[in-house]
């Protein structure tokens, strides 16, 4: 689900760069060879708020492993993505399951993200064609809106919109749509911070637009790029107690 976090740091402004080229540079900034993240997933379902903590290791766009550390109900839950497959291990059942088919559309641990969102980590410039929108930004003064159209009819979100600060060249908001054009997800990117050569959002707020009064906030407490990751983290053998 880390394709939500794209930003770009460079010279010039968005209008001077073709939309597709800008998207390629966004990808270049996002996709380090490897990443490690420690974060908090704060889930507000409109009635109560609960916080999950997790560590995640990512290699390129095809492999990732997440280990949930708290609260007690989710402690020990693990998720492993390799290519186009996603497995989940829960200590309560002491077994792993392959998340596929209709299961991918279900809410991930009660959050505003689906398991399909977890599978959306790919380079946007590879999966989408980009154009600049003529729509004016009412939410963010001076922002430019990028329209993204999926190249493959099987892509989960056929269209997206991204609000970009043309000076800092960072993403402020993203919207994701169904094939019908119905708005499904909205994401806000906040608390940008310089990490190495990257400008990265420390906070992201997700909203499932098919639900009422819910939101899921992801707080990144630790972010490290280009680290060495043991091979065992991307093996199914890690999906056990």
Annotate each PLM feature.
Residues 111-149:
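Short, conserved active-site entrance elements at the starts or edges of catalytic domains
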Residues 21-24, 51-53, 128-134, 187-190, ...:
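Short structured motifs
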Residues 10-15:
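Sec/Tat signal peptide C-region and signal peptidase I cleavage site
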Residues 1-7:
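Bacterial N-terminal signal peptides
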Residues 95-99, 119, 141-236:
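Gly/Pro-enriched, hydrophobic low-complexity segments
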Residues 42, 59-61, 69-71, 84, ...:
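Solvent-exposed coil/turn segments that connect beta secondary-structure elements
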Residues 17-92:
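N-terminal mature ectodomain segment of secretory-pathway/periplasmic proteins
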Residues 90-120:
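Acidic/charged, solvent-exposed loop-and-adjacent secondary-structure segments enriched in E/D, K/R, S/T
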């Amino acid at each position: 689900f880390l394709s939500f976090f794209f930003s770009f740091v460079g010279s010039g402004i968005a209008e001077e760069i073709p939309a597709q080229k800008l998207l390629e540079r966004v990808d270049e900034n996002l996709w380090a060879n490897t990443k490690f993240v420690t974060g908090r997933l704060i889930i507000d379902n409109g009635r109560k708020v609960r916080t999950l903590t997790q560590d995640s290791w990512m290699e390129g766009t095809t492999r990732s492993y997440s280990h949930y550390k708290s609260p007690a109900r989710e402690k020990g839950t693990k998720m492993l993505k390799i290519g186009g497959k996603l497995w989940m291990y829960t200590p309560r059942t002491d077994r792993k399951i392959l998340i596929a088919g209709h299961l991918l559309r279900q809410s991930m641990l009660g959050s505003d993200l689906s398991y399909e969102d977890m599978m959306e980590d790919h380079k946007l410039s590879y999966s989408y064609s980009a154009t600049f929108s003529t729509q004016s930004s009412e939410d963010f003064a001076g922002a430019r809106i990028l329209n993204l159209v999926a190249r493959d009819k099987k892509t989960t979100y056929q269209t997206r919109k991204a609000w970009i600060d043309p000076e800092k060249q960072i993403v402020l908001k993203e919207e994701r749509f169904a094939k019908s054009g119905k708005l499904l997800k909205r994401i806000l990117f906040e608390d940008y911070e310089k990490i190495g050569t990257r400008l990265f959002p420390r906070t992201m707020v997700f909203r499932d637009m098919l639900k009422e009064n819910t939101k899921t906030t992801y707080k990144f407490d630790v972010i490290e790029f280009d680290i060495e990751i043991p091979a065992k983290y991307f093996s199914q053998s890690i999906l056990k107690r």
